[in-house]
């Protein structure tokens, strides 16, 4: 036993792993801090299920749709792997949005490196999910890819050339499908690498907590206390996940994707998966094509502006103004998601413009509300 422990203490790689397991963690963190580890579980589920599906998938426009049918009908447990991978993407993004919203509420963006890497993971995940959505080669897959890739043509001077280069031709074709499959296969591995960097950056600074305090006296070992606590969260989320896979497997998808891609027949309403609807809604709210593309990209990149916040309050728990505004922002996000699947007609277009404006205003007005609250607290006669 002594030799075994000496081996652990002398091996640098194992020491690094053990330091991760026994990381000093604030004693008062709640279940909102569980979603990061749940995200790790879903990332591994996506990588493993995707690897198994890739053995039977054919990235060819003539047989891609039928290879999916073959996976569902003839491959042993293929239907289960496909449903897990398909609905796993929805759960992955749901957990990620909850994870980001918790960080916004508790001001975890003050851990600048952790926050910056996290936004990169979000962008890479969105790219991987978009390319994966094209692979089944259904109607919505084809037309979704056509619309989104065409947005690059809004870039002045070089836009059209970039679109042709991505397509590998004058329209979405076999070369496009092959490229998307290759990128969809490799991107999750790059995301996994970024997650490791994310964890390294987190372990350099330590986790935040609901009070925003940073006292080492109030920290305990992550294992076994919080590892056991995390397991309960895993069981609950995985139970809900498998329940949806077995009872409502196609509830989160689009019915148009059960039809094979037909370039001669445009769907009535082209829309992406539900987890991209908020960004798609912002894209549609701006009449100018280039402006819409900039709005789409900035809907994610604007999260980087949080790094420059220097409010004295370490979270919104005790900041009444910011707390109210935060929940207004969450409702705004949900309404943008709902508006993204509505038809482009009155009154949805007008409401869309309003909520797009308030979405971006949050990141600027929130800063001034924090400053106002800081001044009220720190300049109070009681201080």
From Swiss-Prot:
Its cofactor is heme b. Heme b b566 binds at residues 99, 198. Binds 2 heme b groups non-covalently. The keyword Translocase does not apply. Heme b b562 binds at residues 85, 184. It is found in: Mitochondrion inner membrane. Keywords: Electron transport, Heme, Iron, Membrane, Metal-binding, Mitochondrion, Mitochondrion inner membrane, Respiratory chain, Transmembrane, Transmembrane helix, Transport, Ubiquinone. The chain crosses the membrane at residues 35-55, 79-100, 115-135, 180-200, 228-248, 290-310, 321-341, 348-368. It comes from the Eukaryota. It holds the Pfam family Cytochrome_B. GO terms for molecular function: metal ion binding; ubiquinol-cytochrome-c reductase activity. Belongs to the cytochrome b family. Heme 1 (or BL or b562) is low-potential and absorbs at about 562 nm, and heme 2 (or BH or b566) is high-potential and absorbs at about 566 nm. The main subunits of complex b-c1 are: cytochrome b, cytochrome c1 and the Rieske protein. This is Cytochrome b. The lineage of its organism: Eukaryota, Metazoa, Ecdysozoa, Arthropoda, Hexapoda.
């Amino acid at each position: 036993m002594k030799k075994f422990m000496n081996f652990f203490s002398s091996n640098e790689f194992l020491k690094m792993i053990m330091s991760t397991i026994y990381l000093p963690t604030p004693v008062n963190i709640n279940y909102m801090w569980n979603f990061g580890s749940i995200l790790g579980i879903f990332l591994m589920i996506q990588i493993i299920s995707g690897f198994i599906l890739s053995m039977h998938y054919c990235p060819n426009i003539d047989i891609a749709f039928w290879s999916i049918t073959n996976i569902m009908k003839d491959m042993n447990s293929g239907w289960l792997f496909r449903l897990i991978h398909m609905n796993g993407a929805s759960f992955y993004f749901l957990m990620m949005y909850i994870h980001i919203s918790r960080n916004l509420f508790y001001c975890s963006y003050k851990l600048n490196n952790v926050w910056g890497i996290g936004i990169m993971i979000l962008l890479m995940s969105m790219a991987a999910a978009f390319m994966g959505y094209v692979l089944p080669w259904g109607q919505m897959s084809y037309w979704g890819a056509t619309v989104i890739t065409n947005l690059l043509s809004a870039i002045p001077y070089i836009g059209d050339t970039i679109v042709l280069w991505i397509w590998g031709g004058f329209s979405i074709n076999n070369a496009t499908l092959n490229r998307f499959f290759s990128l969809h296969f490799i991107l999750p591995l790059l995301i996994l690498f970024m997650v490791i960097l994310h964890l390294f950056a987190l372990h350099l600074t330590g986790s935040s907590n609901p009070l925003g305090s940073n006292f080492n006296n109030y920290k305990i070992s992550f294992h076994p206390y919080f590892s056991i606590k995390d397991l309960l969260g895993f069981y609950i989320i995985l139970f809900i996940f498998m329940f949806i896979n077995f009872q409502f497997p196609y509830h989160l998808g689009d019915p148009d994707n059960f039809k094979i891609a037909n370039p001669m027949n445009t769907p009535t309403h082209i829309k992406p998966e539900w987890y991209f609807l908020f960004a798609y809604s912002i894209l549609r709210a701006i009449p100018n094509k280039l402006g819409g593309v900039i709005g789409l990209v900035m809907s994610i990149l604007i999260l980087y502006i949080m790094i420059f916040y220097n409010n004295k309050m370490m979270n919104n728990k005790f900041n009444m103004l910011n707390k109210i505004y935060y929940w207004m922002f969450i409702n705004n996000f949900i309404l943008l998601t709902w508006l993204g699947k509505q038809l482009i007609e009155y009154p949805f277009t007008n409401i869309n413009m309003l909520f797009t404006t308030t979405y971006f205003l949050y990141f600027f007005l929130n800063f001034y509300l924090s400053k106002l609250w800081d001044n009220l607290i720190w300049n109070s006669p009681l201080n």
